[in-house]
């Protein structure tokens, strides 16, 4: 069984994150743990693009980008899948250059 992290950044495309979360929830027999981390900008873009705060409707564990106590912030957390959807160019650039300044980039680094 899988332990999955979904990271949602402030890039345009919140509908993709919403659809992914719906699909993952529907396939919950395929994973043991599903965690979500959203940036502040992701929440604003979601509200703008989708006109709601429906991320609150998903029965999963949410983390803030400053919560470095999240289990997936460490390699010993044994998460096997991380999906960044949508991924902003800023986040992608920080990951590519090894700059870990928040929970998303830290989790991608481990």
Residue spans of the language-model regions?
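A cross-family phosphate/adenosyl-ligand binding-site feature
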Residues: 1-110
